From Swiss-Prot:
Its main location: cytoplasm. Catalyzes the specific attachment of an amino acid to its cognate tRNA in a 2 step reaction: the amino acid (AA) is first activated by ATP to form AA-AMP and then transferred to the acceptor end of the tRNA. Residues 251-254 are annotated as: Aspartate. The gene is DARS1. One of its GO terms (biological process) is translation. It comes from Homo sapiens (Human). It is found in: Cytoplasm, Cytosol. One of its GO terms (cellular component) is cytoplasm. This is Aspartate--tRNA ligase, cytoplasmic.
Length: 501
């Protein structure tokens, strides 16, 4: 006589067979084998952003991440996310889906990547929680392409929740260190996607505008033999049997290109600052947008060209990236960025007068501190209703050695900074193009002439008057969007305390 245990097993096996037999949809779902480029199936994947009413009743394939899943009786609702776009998908028991398929879909780990075949259906009521609000996908097949681990280091819904909402409702938000420690997950949020797509737009508009103005894009060395601006804030690297340094800017090389008759040049590339500054706006590595240009008679020719380039960038962002701006504003509310045409220009002495009138004590040759920059930004906004402006004629004492002195006032210089929302985003000037004066200024700053010999020599064979400036990409992105920390606009930020990921 068979044992009770054996009897139970003999009963369970037919039930399993029966269940399997009843699962008429078993070929329509599951975990796919790893894609190793074995084949190229005749299948067209549709972008989630293209799932609109125009595709109603079409059968489509979509590859996306499982953002959320919610089982309800004999059906399961999924939100499928692809970059910053998402769509609701419905898996319901019927001709194409068995109860086992519904259960499988409901238990797919969040952030897993799936291939879904479904029919695009128009919905009677807009789906407010999705970007594709007028349609949903009725799933006929679903296969897991890449399975995410069940425990995520952070929840994406928490990562996009406005801080004010989290505080008021006692709901979770994600702090900065957690975001940066798990940057790959954080970059998947709609806010991060919008920030870095807009940042890409800044680079594109910068390049597009300058090429249209007749500029040539150049690439300059990042490993150099001496501190590029004569300062101590450089990273030292081993260079065979000698020391070399990471460039603080492409400054000296873009000037040498002007001496080589390129006339108008720009570059986009990394710059390095060994400054132990743990502030909201400093990084040890960031992307520099640099410009240098020969002029005819006055450095304002260059200053105005740079200002116009910035205005073209602002216009382009507002015209082409409204969706991204609105996405960021949803989590980080901010007033729209304002600018004037032509750009407001104030002399440094005028800025000092405004600050002194507001109660700030400053000497004529003092540099602006960060709090005073912010205060000046508020004063300028109140008086002129602009977030973007230029300060001209800085004190010579606070500028680099290659800055041209003002011929009318030896304590001033032919230099300027540009500001967004009360924070400096560009520092620029007319450069000294006379080798004798350049040598004198370098010695005044205590710079070893031997280490910048090639730079000074480039001016000995005839050099046109020229000027330029350097812009911090991450700062421009941060300030245009009204964000509060430059680490939000650096994809993988580097600061004195962070070297990974």
């Amino acid at each position: 006589m068979p044992s009770a245990s054996a009897s139970r097993k003999s009963q369970e096996k037919p039930r399993e067979i029966m269940d399997a037999a009843e699962d008429y949809a078993k070929e329509r779902y599951g975990i796919s084998s790893m894609i190793q480029s074995q084949e190229k199936p005749d299948r067209v994947l549709v972008r989630v952003r293209d799932l609109t009413i125009q595709k109603a009743d079409e059968v489509v394939w979509v590859r996306a991440r499982v953002h959320t899943s919610r089982a309800k009786g004999k059906q399961c609702f999924l939100v499928l996310r692809q970059q910053q776009f998402n769509v609701q998908a419905l898996v319901a028991v019927g001709d194409h889906a068995s109860k086992q398929m519904v259960k499988f879909a409901a238990n797919i780990n969040k952030e897993s990547i799936v291939d879904v075949e479904g029919v695009v259906r128009k919905v009677n009521q807009k789906i407010g929680s999705c970007t594709q609000q007028d349609v949903e996908l009725h799933v006929q097949k679903i296969y897991v392409i890449s399975l995410a681990e069940p425990r995520l280091p952070l929840q994406l819904d928490d990562a996009v929740r406005p801080e004010a909402e989290g505080e008021e409702e006692g709901r979770a938000t994600v702090n900065q260190d957690t975001r940066l420690d798990n940057r790959v997950i954080d970059l998947r949020t709609s806010t991060s996607q919008a920030v870095f797509r807009l940042q890409s737009g800044i680079c594109h508009l910068f390049r597009e505008t300058l090429i249209n103005k007749g500029f040539v894009e150049i690439q300059t060395p990042k490993i150099i033999s001496a501190a590029s601006e004569g300062g101590a804030n450089v990273f030292t690297v081993s260079y065979f049997k000698n020391n070399a340094y990471l460039a603080q800017s492409p400054q000296l090389y873009k000037q040498m290109c002007i001496c080589a008759d390129f006339e108008k040049v720009f570059s986009i590339g990394p710059v390095f600052r060994a400054e132990d500054s743990n502030t909201h706006r400093h990084l040890t590595e960031f992307v520099g947008l640099d410009i240098e240009m020969a002029f005819n008679y006055h450095y304002h020719e260059v200053m105005e060209e740079i200002a116009d380039t910035m205005v073209q960038i602002f216009k382009g962002l507002q015209e082409r990236f409204q969706t991204e701006i609105q996405t960021v504003n949803k989590q980080f509310p901010c007033e729209p960025f304002k600018f004037l045409e032509p750009t407001l220009r104030l002399e440094y002495c005028e800025a000092l007068a405004m600050l002194r009138e507001a109660g700030v004590e400053m000497g004529d040759e003092d540099d602006l501190s960060t709090p005073n920059e912010k205060l000046l930004g508020h004063l300028v906004k109140e008086k002129y209703d602009t977030d973007f402006y230029i300060l001209d004629k800085y004190p010579l004492a606070v500028r680099p050695f290659y800055t041209m002195p003002d011929p009318r006032n030896p304590k001033q210089s032919n230099s300027y900074d540009m500001f967004m929302r009360g924070e400096e985003i560009l520092s620029g000037a007319q450069r000294i193009h006379d080798p004798q004066l350049l040598t004198e200024r370098a010695l005044h700053h205590g710079i070893d002439l031997e280490k910048i010999k090639a730079y000074i020599d480039s001016f000995r064979f005839g050099a046109p008057p020229h000027a330029g400036g350097g812009i911090g990409l991450e700062r421009v992105t941060m300030l245009f969007l009204g964000l509060h920390n430059v680490r939000q606009t650096s994809m993988f930020p580097r600061d004195p305390k962070r070297l990974t990921p």
